[in-house]
A protein has these predicted regions:
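Intracellular juxtamembrane helix-capping segments at the cytosolic ends
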Residues: 57-70, 287-302
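Intracellular loop-helix junctions on the cytosolic face of multi-pass helical membrane proteins
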Residues: 31, 35-47, 57-58, 62-63, ...
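Helical-face signature of the major facilitator-like transporter fold
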Residues: 48-52, 183, 187, 271, ...
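C-terminal ends and interior cores of transmembrane alpha-helices
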Residues: 13-38, 257-269
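A late C-terminal transmembrane helix in Major Facilitator Superfamily
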Residues: 303-335
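C-terminal transmembrane helical hairpin of 12-TM major facilitator-type secondary transporters
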Residues: 248-292
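Loop-to-transmembrane helix entry
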Residues: 80, 116-117, 207-231, 312, ...
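Helix-to-loop junctions at the C-terminal end of transmembrane segments
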Residues: 1-7, 235-248, 332
Length: 372
């Protein structure tokens, strides 16, 4: 129903990116628009909501393009390329504020105002997004419905039959659910990393839990450096992943490496040595961005409603984080209220994710239609 002369996925990519660019230009200026504090906070929250929605609107179609146009044998490689490029973008995002500061652009600002180095980073990110989307839009030629049906060896009308999300889930291939289980453990683990890394590093390296202290702020600054190294590890590992012939082994090994990284964090008391575990964590992150979609899109061959299924699969990213956030306080109390122990919880979750990979079967494409 969404096929038009501009393609099936490209319009979503273009519109979602356009909204994201607009928000990226407005968001860092929230404190400079003369609004009251409460109004500025609401503006920021609404802007983040639009940014998150628009980025999802843009990212899902380019993942679907791989599922639409890349054969089964090369999908893992294609998703690894996407993982490499995504993490390269993250790397650039971490570098730009430091680079602008080194060039003499102010890294400090009055209370309630974002520093120029951060504002310019947002602008550069918006420009890069525009250029990348324009390149994709102008160079990728999507198939028309007939070509798509011929390539995927199914009838053109297979995607036209209406089906509710409950019906789709009931008819989903088993791989959809098995990869979803792996996703649950992985995204819960990373939710705890994002939530508790700052407090962990402040406690184990700077020996403080006072969020108002200078030491805590220094720890927060160093977390940004560690996330840079995580992104760098992801970029490098995304190049290695396609060279591992067995996809399940590649996925499981990556998650186990990440689990080792999480487990190391509480026991390292030197900020420079913390680079190693975060590089290892980056290996798991690279696999999480590439492997799940390769398994699921291969399993969905012949099912139809691929876009709807990938949209539903996005729930395996959101729901684990919601559950992890809801349970985080209880778990923290259970592990002695020490934030660094949550990194061990994250390690255990990632290890469970690695073990769950063994449940995934390599499905052969099928010619199926949705049963109402």
């Amino acid at each position: 129903r969404t096929w038009c002369r501009f393609g099936r996925r490209i319009p979503y990519l273009f519109i979602g990116s356009a909204v994201a660019v607009a928000v990226m230009c407005l968001l860092p200026n929230a404190g400079s628009l003369g609004m009251a504090v409460s109004t500025a906070m609401v503006f920021g929250l609404v802007s983040l909501m639009f940014l998150d929605t628009s980025i999802n609107m843009a990212m899902q179609p380019f993942k679907m393009l791989v599922g639409d146009m890349v054969n089964e044998r090369q999908k893992s490689f294609a998703y690894s390329i996407q993982s490499f490029l995504c993490n390269s973008g993250s790397l650039a995002g971490y570098v730009f504020p430091f680079l602008f500061t080194a060039c003499g652009i102010a890294n400090e600002a009055p209370k309630g105002v974002v520093p120029d180095s951060v504002i310019f980073s947002f602008y550069i990110g918006a420009i890069i997004l525009i250029l990348c989307v324009l390149y994709t839009t102008l160079t990728v030629k999507e198939w028309n419905p007939k070509e798509y049906a011929e390539y995927n060896e199914r009838k053109p009308e297979a995607d036209e039959k209406k089906a509710g999300w409950i019906t789709l889930l009931r008819n989903a291939p088993s791989t959809f659910w098995k990869v979803g289980l792996v996703q649950f453990f992985c995204w819960a683990a990373f939710m705890y990393m994002w939530t508790y890394t700052n407090g962990t590093i402040a406690d184990t390296v700077w020996h403080t839990s006072d969020v108002a202290s200078k030491a805590y702020q220094e720890a927060g600054n160093w977390v940004g450096v560690l996330f840079f190294w995580q992104a760098l590890g992801s970029v490098v590992w995304a190049v290695v992943l396609p060279r591992i012939k067995n996809e399940r082994w590649a996925y499981a090994i990556s998650l186990l490496i990440g689990a080792v990284g999480f487990a190391m964090v509480p026991f390292i008391h030197n900020e420079n040595l913390l680079v190693l575990p975060y590089v290892l964590i980056g290996c798991a992150w690279a696999a999480m961005l590439a492997m799940p979609f390769a398994f699921v899109t291969n399993a969905l061959e012949g099912y139809g409603h691929k876009g709807a299924y990938l949209g539903l699969f996005n729930g395996t990213i959101c729901l684990p984080q919601i559950v992890a956030a809801a349970c985080g306080g209880t778990l923290l109390a259970m592990v002695g209220s020490h934030q660094y122990n949550m990194m061990l919880v994250a390690a255990a979750l990632l290890a469970l994710g690695a073990l769950s990979v063994s449940l995934i079967n390599k499905n052969k494409p099928q010619n199926l239609t949705i049963q109402q």
